[in-house]
Amino acid sequence: QKNELLYAKHLKIEKTKKILGIARWIKKIPINNSLKRIFIVGWYGTETVGDKAILAGIVNHYKSEYDNKVEFVIGSLYPFVTKRTCYELSINASVVSTKTFELLSNAKSSDIIVMGGGPLMDLNELYVPLLAFKVAKAYRKKTVVFGCGLGPLKYDKFENAVKDILSYSDEIKLRDY
């Protein structure tokens, strides 16, 4: 519980400017040079049928692009739900919590960071793709927004976060806007 308070204190939109200082102290995860590591973040852990379909589409896209030489890590708000989804969809992936510094360690250690599915809208959880992309760009990683919706955006804090996410993105593939 003490760690949860520490993570909650630092993993939020308002801490974007300080996050690189924290990320510097977090160990990189060793990589397998023969595999591309794809770190997928989004609103996983709250999966709808649409979220599951988009996740399967993202996984199939990168398996095809890299001839199955890929390793998937999925960042989840509720990992136990996402583990069940991976089982149901026969997706071989590690699942990590986006409520811990695993978010940062995977963002700096993966080859490609994908914000996949779900909307970019007024949600406090926008810190997930925002912080992941900010760290990824600092470590020269590729970032992709894949299959997301856009809006509604009513508050400046969230509108600015979405603008930052999109500006950090190397590729943007929206489903609607």
Predicted feature residues:
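Aromatic- and Gly/Pro-rich donor/ligand-binding loops
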Residues: 1-155, 164
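Membrane-proximal helix-turn-helix segments that form the acceptor-binding/catalytic region
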Residues: 157-171
